[in-house]
Structure formats: structure tokens, C-alpha cells
Amino acid sequence: MSTILESLPTGQKVGIAFSGGLDTSAALHWMRLKGAVPYAYTANLGQPDEDDYDSIPRRATEYGAEGARLIDCRAQLVAEGIAALQSGAFHISTAGVTYFNTTPIGRAVTGTMLVAAMKEDGVNIWGDGSTYKGNDIERFYRYGLLVNPDLKIYKPWLDQTFIDELGGRAEMSEFMRQSGFAYKMSAEKAYSTDSNLLGATHEAKDLESLESGIKIVNPIMGVAFWRDDVQIAKEEVTVRFEEGQPVALNGKTFPNAVELLLEANRIGGRHGLGMSDQIENRIIEAKSRGIYEAPGLALLFAAYERLVTGIHNEDTIEQYRESGRRLGRLLYQGRWFDPQAIMLRETAQRWVARAITGEVTLELRRGNDYSILSTKSPNLTYQPERLSMEKVASTFSPRDRIGQLTMRNLDITDTRDKLRVYSQVGLLAPGEASALPQIKGDKE
């Protein structure tokens, strides 16, 4: 039997992830009028553009919800965000500027916690506002079924009857007005925004055109650093980690990780740190474009990676980064709690993050322009005296280096022989301007 319901299950409990926006408000009221028994579940993810969470369940009840609950997901969201940071679970970047997978992390938390709450209420049918072309429909599907194997999925936006009756925002707004609700449709923006405490995503509409840039976006977690009239003073900030956990900013500790990240957001946001413009591949392999904000995570990650490079050896760092890219893709695909993701994540947390203790001081300027001013850690393996150009006691002598270089003759000879073979069979034919050695067919 299919887990996807294409028509409204009348007379049954239907849970809906309720944001309080026009789409979910109209869908909830429509479901009630059509004979379903809707239950509304709202995730408090610390969205920077939401200032009245307590009113959302009340509105859901007014629109016809049989029950409405507000689920505080902030602690879990920050915990998963720090886990992603510790394991470098970020696979999308452009010219070294990173997208911190803030929406996929939010979906992992929302999908599991809301369905768990529904299960407590005996609600085994779930709907949300994700569209069939996006990533979220698959993410929510996977996380929901992981928590509740008996779950059925009903999405009004996949129901042709709903689409025919309320297919657009104008129709939804008129439907709510005719139902007696003073619902005023908000002004249409040039793009769509989704956010949580970790970061914000701006996409769709005008941003679908690559001719439209970051300058049309109004940041909600930071400042428009590209504007000449925005004054941004440079600022020094010190980040302290203990065993992979961020614990202090500028010497100040916090009662919990949520409060620390909020302060990191404020500091990074003052500079527009962590904003990026990315072209990415959705789960269905179609390319999309997003402009992202993540000021707090960007600040913490800059300090964390500095300590990683000062503490761990080259092979460990290489493994951390390769595994992080793979883990980031799993996270993006809605597989954050799959066994292969847990293995990669916990390996990094144990063998990389646990050694990360120390302080990094940065100077923040505009956007992603910053400098590292100081790095301190009791675990540093960076020892400048080993390679000092001054006359100091050395761990190896010039004669030692002569011997080491002499041993390289073996692989240099092997490389030269291979290049000669490639040249003979026509695989190697560099032009005159090439720096590649002109290996001839005959030995010299």
C-alpha cells in the first residue's frame, strides 16, 4: 500500500507542519471544511524573522485545528549544527566560500521531532508545505518514516482538488477572507526566504535568474556589506573551543549552546560574515541557485578549522575533509541519521573534534573578509623551531636532507621512464609553451 495519499483522508487525523503563513493557514482551514481532522505542529527553530511563536498555535486553532502544539527544537537544532561543524559536513562551496547546510540540518530536526510529537497524539498522517520539485519533500519523507513506520503522507499541494480550488496565493487569501478571517496577504518579495537559528536561505523567483545577484537580497541575519552606505567597523573576536565544543566568545561563556550561537550570529552578522551565492545540485540532480546566510556558523567554523590544521597531521586532515564532503552530501539528501552518516560523523567527532581545544582570535571586516590574528592551543603540533631559517638547534642536519633527497632518485627515475613511455605511444605531446619536460623517446 502506498504511503502517499493523493486525496484528503476525510474523518481522519491529519497532522500539518504549520508555519502560520498563508499557505499552511489556508490548507489547514480547507482540510477542516472538507471533513478531515487537522492537527497543527509548529517547530520553534529560532527563525530570525519570527518574533511571536506563541501566537501561531492559537491561530491554528482559530482556523480549525483540533489540536495545536509548539515544539521547541532549538537545542536539538544547535546540537546537530555543531555536529555538522565538527565533522565538516559541508559539500557545497564556490571559490572556498562554504554553504553550511543550514536548511538540511533544520529539516532533519523538524522532520523527526514533529513526527514524534504527532505519534504521541495518535496522528499517523502528515502533511507539509514542500513542493514536488524541491529537496524537502524527500527529506521530510525519509525522516518521517524513520520515526513512524506507519506514517502516511498527505500533502495538499499534491492533491489536484486542492490545487484546482486554491492553486495560488491570491486564491488562498480570498478564501481566508471569505471564511471570515482578516488575513492580509503579505507583499510579494522578489525571492523566497526560509530560515532557522543556524542560517537563512534565499531562493526562487527573481533569484532563479543568474543575472540577478546578491544585491537584490535583504539580509535577515546580517548586513548588506556590499552597499557603500553600510558602515562596518572592523572587530576582533576570540573563539574558544574545548574538546570540539565552542564554549566562549571574547572570554564570555554562555548557559547553553543556543545562547552561544545567538551571540555568534550577532557578531558575525554585524559584518555580513557567512553569506554565499551557490549553484548546487538538488536531490533529483537538477541545478538550483541559493543565496545563504550563516554568520554564527561561519565564525565558529573559521576558528575550528584553524585549530584542526594546527593540531592534526596531513593525512587526518585529508580524511576529515573527504569524509566531511561525503557526509555533507548525505545530510543534503536527507540521510543525516542513516548508518553510513552516523559512522562518518561519529568518527570525526571522536578522532578529530575531541582534540580541538584552544583559542583563535580573528579580525572581521566586511562580508567574508577576515584575518586570523592569533592561534593558541595546548595540543598544537605546529613547532616553528623545527623549520626555522635561523641558526638554531635542529631535529635534522643538512647531511640528513642530502640522504633524504638521494632516496628520491628512485621515484624520479620511475616517473621519467613512465613519461618517456607516454611520449612514445603518443599520449604525451605538450606544446612548446608547456612547462612539462620534453621527454624524448631515446634515453639521454
Curated annotation (Swiss-Prot):
Residues the record lists as binding L-aspartate: T131, N135, D136
Enzyme Commission code: 6.3.4.5
Subunit structure: Homotetramer.
Binding of L-citrulline, residues: Y99, N135, R139, S192, T201, E203, E280
Similarity comment text for this entry: Belongs to the argininosuccinate synthase family. Type 2 subfamily.
Annotated keywords: Amino-acid biosynthesis, Arginine biosynthesis, ATP-binding, Cytoplasm, Ligase, Nucleotide-binding
Binding-site residues for ATP, renumbered to this chain: A17, F18, S19, G20, G21, L22, D23, T24, S25, A43, G129, T131, D136, D194
Catalytic reactions on record: L-citrulline + L-aspartate + ATP = 2-(N(omega)-L-arginino)succinate + AMP + diphosphate + H(+)
PROSITE patterns recorded: ARGININOSUCCIN_SYN_1 (PS00564), ARGININOSUCCIN_SYN_2 (PS00565)
Protein name: Argininosuccinate synthase
Keyword Heme among UniProt keywords: no
BP GO annotations: argininosuccinate metabolic process; L-arginine biosynthetic process; urea cycle
Biochemical pathway: Amino-acid biosynthesis; L-arginine biosynthesis; L-arginine from L-ornithine and carbamoyl phosphate: step 2/3
UniProt xrefs under Pfam families: Arginosuc_syn_C (PF20979), Arginosuc_synth (PF00764)
UniProt KW Ligase keyword: yes
GO molecular function: argininosuccinate synthase activity; ATP binding; protein homodimerization activity
SUPFAM superfamilies linked: Adenine nucleotide alpha hydrolases-like (SSF52402), Argininosuccinate synthetase, C-terminal domain (SSF69864)
Record's GO cellular component terms: cytoplasm
InterPro entries (alphabetical): Arg_succ_synth_type2_subfam (IPR023437), Arginosuc_syn_C (IPR048268), Arginosuc_syn_N (IPR048267), Arginosuc_synth (IPR001518), Arginosuc_synth_CS (IPR018223), Arginosuc_synth_type_1_subfam (IPR023434), AS_cat/multimer_dom_body (IPR024074), AS_multimer_C_tail (IPR024073)
Subcellular location field: Cytoplasm
